[in-house]
């Protein structure tokens, strides 16, 4: 029992230790009292300095408005009776500061609305861009999703039909797509050496047809004969009175037709008429 109660017993403090603690507390209290006295002396000196400043600045006349006061002016004009809190107090709830903050908030809201409108606008499509480039008018030959081959006959036929369907307004120019063959024959000269050799035999047949047409009773009509168009078609199998097929054309005559179509102007192709090609030899004979 004595061994279990032994650790519970605490050694009683000696009177010497208590006296040491009391002496330490008295020393701390004395130091705090000395600090308070020093602070009072500093405050008294500051008041004296402020009084001297007021005496020196009493001759100066400073007309300051309440709106122009700042922290520096408030501290310089403060007297000894005013405390530090009154000198450095800022009026954050004034009317001017509230109005400025309200204007700034409204500016932020307007800018956010403008940015939201810009984000909601869809990007311009290619059709609208091409219409703006043409002065707001629709472009007949604009970007197409599916375009035929440039060397095929579908390209030339489709572009020609589109140019006839669309009405051309004044002051606009249409873009016409030429096939590779038309461009080649448009850049080359009309009378090629290779074609002249092939056309020698055909010229004789055309002369015979011209003489036959002169003997006919319709020779005096104003419509000129078109032997070359009939000669371009293949000879019919059923006879001379059968109607020739539309697609039965010789390759040489097809080149002539393409070459004649290339002589039309690019600006207004829809108003031009298709004229037959007459070689230079026949022109000299007619003259």
Curated annotation (Swiss-Prot):
Coiled-coil positions: 25-58
Keywords assigned by UniProt, alphabetized: Coiled coil, Synapse
Taxonomic superkingdom: Eukaryota
Major site of localization recorded for this protein: other
Signal peptide: none
Keyword Chloroplast assigned: no
Annotated region described as Disordered, given as residue ranges: 1-22, 113-174, 189-287
Gene Ontology CC: postsynaptic density
Annotated InterPro entries: Largen/INSYN1 (IPR027997)
Biased composition (Low complexity): 153-167
UniProt protein name: Inhibitory synaptic factor 1
Gene designation per UniProt: insy1
């Amino acid at each position: 029992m004595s061994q279990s109660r032994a650790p519970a017993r605490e050694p009683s403090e000696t009177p010497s230790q208590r006296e040491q603690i009391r002496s330490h507390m008295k020393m701390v209290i004395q130091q705090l009292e000395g600090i308070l006295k020093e602070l009072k002396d500093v405050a008294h000196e500051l008041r004296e300095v402020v009084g001297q400043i007021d005496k020196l600045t009493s001759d100066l006349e400073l007309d300051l408005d309440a709106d122009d006061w700042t922290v520096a002016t408030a501290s310089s004009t403060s007297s000894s009776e005013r405390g530090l809190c009154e000198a450095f107090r800022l009026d954050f709830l004034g009317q001017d500061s509230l109005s400025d903050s309200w204007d700034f908030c409204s500016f932020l809201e307007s800018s956010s609305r403008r940015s939201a409108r810009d984000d909601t606008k869809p990007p311009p499509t290619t059709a609208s861009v091409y219409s703006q480039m043409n002065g707001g008018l629709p472009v007949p030959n604009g970007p197409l999703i599916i375009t035929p081959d440039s060397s095929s006959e579908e390209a030339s036929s489709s572009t020609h039909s589109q140019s006839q369907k669309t009405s051309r307004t004044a002051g606009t120019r249409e873009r016409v797509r030429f096939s590779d063959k038309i461009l080649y024959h448009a850049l080359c000269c009309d009378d090629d050496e290779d074609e002249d050799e092939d056309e020698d035999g055909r010229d004789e047949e055309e002369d015979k047809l011209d003489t036959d047409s002169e003997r006919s009773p319709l020779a005096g009509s104003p419509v000129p004969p078109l032997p070359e168009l009939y000669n371009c078609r293949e000879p019919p199998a059923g006879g001379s009175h059968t109607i020739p097929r539309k697609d039965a054309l010789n390759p040489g005559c097809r080149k002539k037709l393409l070459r004649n179509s290339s002589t039309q102007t690019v600006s207004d192709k829809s108003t031009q008429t298709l004229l037959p090609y007459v070689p230079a030899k026949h022109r000299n004979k007619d003259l």
